[in-house]
């Protein structure tokens, strides 16, 4: 694999500490993915981890541990970087997931998109694990020079072997559940790392447009994500938000799943939050969401890449207040994402039922019956003690209707601008 790292020392934005503070790769040891020289040691630690071996035994119960680990060591030969690890180990796993759990994946990007550049792919969020995994496969198969480093919340890294595995797979850690002071420091460090990764390590980054998945599929870019991007920019950006964001080469990305296997779990959350004051998800809930998302049926899956927003950012008035700039950038990213949804019959059916509209030219009676059967099957999985059937159904329908609503609004706004 091509390695074009040119990292040595990086000058941080003065708000990260003392002005001109020099940062190198080891400044980010607490959050960064593993470097090539660390991979062999960590791989051996994985093979000696009891819980990891139990998981591997579940996949190949007929193989003795010594044989299984011997085969894994053989596969690891020649792995010199995290990208090599992705191609050797993760690519076959992701292909298996696509074969078993989808009705096919497709990927689109502008014809003139520079596949040798480095970007932040900022997307809506559908699955905790697979959003970035599918993207990496699509980028690799689509001729992009690099796959992505990804941000993953430490609330999901509940076992040491999981943390090791994701860091081998180009993941950096996003810390959750912090105090306000800790959050400021953590956000600054992550921002500095993202700038460092894109411009010094020469890596692509995938990150979601908001913290956590939008439970109702109303995908909106959080200002806080854009503020985090800007806060760790290098000195030469001179505290200018537009220059700071252009330094990251943000390319909006739209992810469209025909079916969300976690839709019934999200509906459950809505009822629990409505009925149980102070209810919060447990670690077990997070694990169930991860497992359901990975193993559940998704139907058709489509990824659509938008043009990098650097040129558009250059048209903004630099004298605008920061708050206004963040608002305009978030709205532009949302329009790019919303206008590129791949809409399926179930989306139109859901909106018609909720809004009383008639888009029957977008689906057949067979489509409607199949979606009704799908909803009934998902509703049967609900674990709420006293399920409010009407409420749960409305919540699930909303998840499928919102992409259509946002798509229609975005297309109308774009046509008005033109």
Which role does the model predict for each range below?
Residues 2-119, 125-136, 140, 147, ...:
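Membrane-anchoring hydrophobic helices of lipid-metabolizing enzymes
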Residues 7-20, 238-244, 315-324, 357-363, ...:
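Intrinsically disordered, low-complexity coil segments
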Residues 11-12, 90-310, 314, 381-385:
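Soluble catalytic domains of membrane acyltransferases
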Residues 80, 84, 177-184, 216, ...:
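Charge-dense, low-complexity intrinsically disordered segments
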Residues 82, 223-229, 237-240, 286-287, ...:
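General structural signal for secondary-structure boundaries
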Residues 193-195, 287, 365-378, 398-402:
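Short, highly charged low-complexity linear segments
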Residues 283-353:
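C-terminal structural cap/anchor segments
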Residues 338-389:
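C-terminal structured domain segments
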